[in-house]
A protein has these predicted regions:
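Conserved donor-binding/catalytic core segment of Leloir-type glycosyltransferases
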Residues: 4, 146, 182-209, 223
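Short alpha-helical donor nucleotide-sugar binding micro-motif in glycosyltransferases
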Residues: 252-253, 260-265
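A conserved mid-protein helix/loop that constitutes part of the nucleotide-sugar donor-binding site
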Residues: 12-19, 194-213, 229-232, 318
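Aromatic "clamp/platform" in nucleotide-sugar-dependent glycosyltransferases that forms part
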Residues: 273
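Carbohydrate-associated surface elements
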Residues: 151, 171
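Conserved acidic donor-binding segment of nucleotide-sugar-dependent glycosyltransferases
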Residues: 305-306, 310-317, 326-331
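A short, well-ordered alpha-helix in the C-terminal region of glycosyltransferases
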Residues: 319, 326, 333-348, 354
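Short hydrophobic beta-strand element within catalytic cores of glycosyltransferases
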Residues: 290-293
Length: 355
């Protein structure tokens, strides 16, 4: 069977799907709007998977267009049609509705599978009515729509009148994401998120301030991984709160280092104000790390309150600080949640089963 993937070749989620389906001896070609990095190209070559790139970023830059709009995506459509004619796919599978999904819709190819990822459903249609109209067209053009969470499936039903969505969560390879052989030397609270307003980094810093400066606990440290438009502002806030000795920002880390990051943690934090799924929570859980998450989007599906961690309202640093402190004070509770977290992932979110 020939499957044409319309997806960002650089995305770790695309890479995982392609590698796993390739192991099932499916014939796959990846069509990416943007140029893949050299290491990604090498991975696809090692698997013997052809990769076509529209290199849209370079073309837009050469045309001196200030940003990439949906109209700019149409410049890649001619290359896509040429690719389809040469490859003759049996199935087209587009990942991310508001870009690759648009190309799948325009191709008029059937069968067409659409996988929605999050911001394509939560953010893109909220910008204007044209976006919402376009996304509804894309969603209804697909033979099958796949969502990573029940929460996002509900949004697609209520906002776009598509009710037969299949839920296939992002899974975790528990052989790769596994507990460290030894416990961490210090109690470290961590998160891996883009440093943007909706991801609750400011809430985490406020909770750190409560723990350090109000609870007077100097044994808990904080590790924040990621980059984004608010990184400088969050670093300055850390300094202003007098937390520089307790909070470390690492910036971006490559995916192959994420296991090592999780294994350093005592507690993982994800207190976003919106979240389609929460794969990082599952990766932490597979490493035996309990989580504290907000009760939004798909997060309650991956983190069970009082079992694998705590589920709290977003923007509530007092509750976040209190939940962290509970796990710090009660080692037996933390040990049990570590065991529960690992068990939950291996039984409910096994990557091979999801594939």
């Amino acid at each position: 069977m020939k499957i044409l993937f319309l997806a960002d070749a650089n995305s770790i989620h695309t890479i995982k799907w392609v590698e796993s389906l390739h192991k099932h001896e499916l014939n796959i070609l990846v069509f990416s709007l943007f140029k893949p990095t050299d290491d990604v190209v090498q991975k696809y070559q090692n698997w013997g998977i052809p990769l076509i790139s529209a290199d849209l970023q370079s073309k837009i830059r050469n045309l001196r267009v200030p940003n990439i709009s949906k109209l700019n995506y149409l410049t890649a459509f001619r290359l896509l049609k040429k690719t389809m004619n040469a490859f003759e796919p049996d199935i087209i599978h587009a990942h991310y509705a508001s870009s690759y999904g648009v190309l799948g819709y325009l191709s008029k190819f059937k069968p067409f599978i659409l996988s929605v990822w999050g911001s394509d459903v939560y953010d893109f249609p909220q910008k204007n009515q044209l976006n919402k109209w376009l996304l509804k067209k894309v969603i209804h053009s697909a033979n099958t729509v796949c969502s990573t969470s029940e929460a996002m499936k509900a949004v697609i039903a209520t906002q776009f009148d598509r009710f037969d969505v299949k839920v296939i969560p992002f899974g975790v390879d528990a052989n790769v994401f596994a507990p460290a052989s030894e416990s961490p030397d210090q109690f470290t609270v961590g998160t891996i998120k883009s440093i943007e307003a909706h991801n609750g980094i400011d809430c985490l810093l406020d909770a750190a301030n409560i723990i350090i400066n109000e609870y007077h606990n100097t044994y808990i440290h904080f590790l924040i991984v990621g980059q984004g438009s608010l990184l400088g502002e969050m670093k300055q806030k850390t300094t202003d709160l007098g937390l520089d000795n307790y909070v470390k920002f690492t910036g971006y880390i490559p995916h192959e280092k994420i296991v090592e990051f999780h294994q350093k943690l005592s507690v993982f934090i994800s207190v976003s104000t919106r979240e389609s799924f929460g794969v990082a929570v599952l990766e932490a859980a597979a490493c035996g790390v309990p989580a504290i998450t907000s009760n939004v989007g798909g997060l309650p599906e991956v983190n069970q309150n009082n079992y694998t961690g705590y589920v709290i309202p977003p923007n509530d640093p007092e509750k976040l600080a209190n939940s962290i402190f509970k796990l710090f004070k009660d080692k037996n509770l933390k040990d049990q949640m570590e065991e529960n977290a690992r068990d939950h992932v291996t039984k409910q979110f096994n990557w091979n089963k999801n594939v």
